[in-house]
Design a protein with these regions (language model features):
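Conserved alpha/beta catalytic core and glycan-binding cleft of carbohydrate-active enzymes
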Residues: 104-105, 290-292, 307-475, 480, ...
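Short glycine-biased active-site loop of nucleotidyltransferases that positions the nucleotide triphosphate
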Residues: 59, 187-191, 235-242, 359-360, ...
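N-terminal cationic-hydrophobic initiation segments that often serve targeting/anchoring roles
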Residues: 168, 214, 286, 335-339, ...
Length: 636
């Protein structure tokens, strides 16, 4: 404990507790330290002592920390802490700071030396830039169900690293977001009910194996974001619950302690030792595993005292409000600590309400995140896509309302795992109609998503044209790639993702009106929207998306500048499963025909249930009137 800052631990500002607490090798053995302030006694138990609580008692130090050293142990030996409560009850607890753990159904911690991995991502780390004005196309992955062995076994971290990094890079994703890999006991929780906040789940291998996973992603230029869950923890006896016989990590107040809807406990954000535990966990993943960001789960449940609670089940804060002031302070401290570790980190909030200033700096009164999932856009789009195209005209605002607030925060547009489970249908399954209409609907939607302001996230499997919902206990329907239509869908994803990555107009100005302009926002009868994306350096892309099964050969609208427009991408391309009959094969020239309140306009072809992207080139002088032409083309 020579370098341990007890004041920082108590005060809730420590970010490196994992270097002291937990189990660490010494010249003479392994030293164990655990925080159990209410315990009557604590000992270390394991296979090495036949789990005898009397074999290796620990001595109590300042701050409720217990310590002992045991000789003759080896890496991977299993252990727990035998914690005796004031009542005399003894519970065997996993180490909250363990680096490694048994694979379920085992619940013991394992000795592990974290040092020694030889990283090869130095060039990637040196080239990192802030996320704001660069492309971010995220492939969300559940490692256990992306792909399985023929016998149903999981792939390990190293095999996943090799295959997934190649696959994601080939498909045009430059980031993967992992559903939680912090150790968890129940597969059905998908990782969102954790027990090990410092241990990558042993389902897929060791800590060094997970380091290899991140390393290989980085070597292929792919960032890695981890879902991280500070909102609640599971109630398994070997975990954090009532750690020393009384609430330690959770609130003692019964009106704050339980999250009844999830059957979990809520962290005590007002207790310094708990804040330090969580801050150290976040910093640990960023620092020791070179992760590029954390997506913080269920932020709304942290911010509101009445979240999931009825009247009488919660107590107002000192100001009489329903905000959890301690959680607000914690989130600000979390983001401050994360940016201290990595100034280019991505701190992403899953916040489902209209809480203000989520992605504003702490110094400006914000929570300090730099990205936030746009749940409103996601809900509107999922509702819209399920509608029969004839009814979509009555819900056109679902397409356009997001631009009323698109620049109020730094948004990520998510089509996440939550939208393809619990009878919600896969992305393709949300679309009405036959196979052709469903796949065409996916293509048009993906163009809309990738060209709409904001960073992007798509859950695995959409690129296969998968019909079935996600099944965490299986794998993606890879067999679909035996079908021509599904291969073409995957080819489309590859092409449109790569197009996004290589065109700055689609990402350089994602959080300001300077990067976006509506050309047609109110054509509800045709289920069509048209807009321009700009990069601020003269490049313009015109995007037209048609959510109707009717194609348009001469769709006219006003344009702000006199340019020639050339089609660069069409969802009707035969390579993607389209018909090839609805293309803008020739350059489209601006004409001196007023439309939509503008002096000049163009007329283009838009495929049924399709989308086109055209690039503008050249700005022209106003032409002289020519009486011989009713529709005068501006010179090229």
């Amino acid at each position: 404990m020579e370098h341990f800052d007890l004041a920082a631990f108590y005060g809730g500002s420590a970010t490196e507790l994992y270097r002291t607490l937990g189990a660490h090798r010494t010249p003479d053995g392994w030293v164990f330290r655990v925080w159990a302030p209410h315990a009557g006694s604590v000992s270390v138990v394991g296979d090495f002592c036949a789990w005898d609580p009397t074999a290796h008692p620990m001595r109590r130090l300042d701050g409720g920390i217990w310590e002992t050293e045991v000789a003759g142990l080896s890496e991977y030996d299993t252990y727990k802490f035998a914690v005796t409560a004031q009542s005399g009850a003894v519970t065997f607890k996993a180490d909250p700071y363990a680096f490694h753990a048994e694979t379920r159904p085992g619940t013991a911690s394992k000795l592990y030396e974290l040092a020694g991995y030889d990283w090869g991502d130095g060039a990637y780390l040196a080239a990192k830039q802030p996320v704001y004005d660069r492309p971010l196309n995220i492939y969300e992955v559940h490692l256990g169900s992306w792909r399985r062995r023929e016998n149903g076994d999981f792939y390990d971290y190293r095999s996943l690293a090799d295959e997934l990094s190649e696959y994601a890079a080939d498909l045009g994703y430059n980031c993967v977001e992992l559903m939680p890999v912090t150790e968890y006991p129940l597969d059905d929780s998908w990782g969102y009910q954790c027990t090990g906040y410092f241990a990558p789940t042993s389902r897929y291998g060791t800590p060094h194996d997970f380091m290899y996973f991140v390393d290989m992603m980085h070597r292929r230029g792919i960032s890695v974001i981890l879902d991280w869950v500070p909102a609640h923890f599971c109630k398994d006896e070997h975990g954090l619950i009532d750690f020393d016989g009384e609430p330690c990590y959770e609130y003692a107040d019964p009106k704050k302690r339980e999250h009844a809807g999830w059957g979990t406990r809520v962290f005590d954000y007002g207790r310094g030792e708990v804040k330090s535990f969580l801050l150290s966990s976040a910093a640990y993943w960023l620092r020791e595993y070179h992760l590029d960001g954390l997506r913080v789960d269920a932020v709304a449940s942290m911010l509101y005292l009445d979240y999931g609670r009825e009247a009488g089940e919660w107590t107002p804060n000192k100001n009489g409000g329903h905000e959890n002031l301690e959680a607000i302070d914690f989130l600000r401290a979390l983001n401050t600590a994360a940016f201290a570790v990595d100034p280019n980190v991505m701190m992403v909030a899953e916040e489902s309400t209209a809480w203000p200033l989520v992605t504003y700096p702490v110094s400006d009164g914000g929570l300090g995140f730099n990205l936030k999932w746009n749940m409103g856009w996601m809900n509107d789009m999922c509702h819209y896509l399920k509608l029969d195209p004839w009814f979509r005209q009555f819900h056109h605002k679902d397409l356009t309302f997001s631009l009323m607030y698109a620049f109020s925060e730094n948004f990520v547009l998510p089509i996440s795992h939550d939208e393809v489970v619990y009878m919600k249908g896969s992305l393709r399954g949300k679309m009405p109609g036959d196979e052709w209409r469903q796949l065409a609907g996916v293509r048009s939607f993906m163009v809309y998503m990738l060209t709409h302001p904001g960073k992007k996230l798509t859950f695995m499997g959409a690129e296969l044209g998968q019909w079935h919902e996600w099944d965490f206990a299986g794998q993606l329907d890879w067999y679909l790639l035996e079908n021509d239509a599904n291969r073409r869908m995957q080819d489309f994803f590859r092409a449109v993702n790569r197009y996004y990555l290589t065109n700055p107009a689609l990402w350089r100005i994602d959080f300001d009106w300077a990067g976006f302009e509506w050309l047609v926002a109110d054509d509800n009868e045709d289920n069509t929207v048209v807009f321009v994306r700009r990069d601020g350096a003269g490049e313009e892309l015109l995007v037209a998306v048609n959510f109707s099964p009717n194609g348009y050969r001469d769709y006219r609208f006003g344009v702000p500048q006199r340019k020639t427009w050339r089609e660069e991408l069409s969802t009707d391309d035969t390579a993607f499963g389209g018909t090839g009959e609805w293309r803008n094969e020739k350059p489209v020239r601006t004409q001196a025909i007023p439309s939509h309140g503008r002096e000049q306009s163009i007329a283009i072809t838009i495929p049924p249930l399709g989308a086109v992207i055209l690039r503008g080139a050249g700005e022209y002088k106003k032409p002289k009137a020519k009486k011989s032409k009713a529709r005068e083309e501006l010179p090229a």
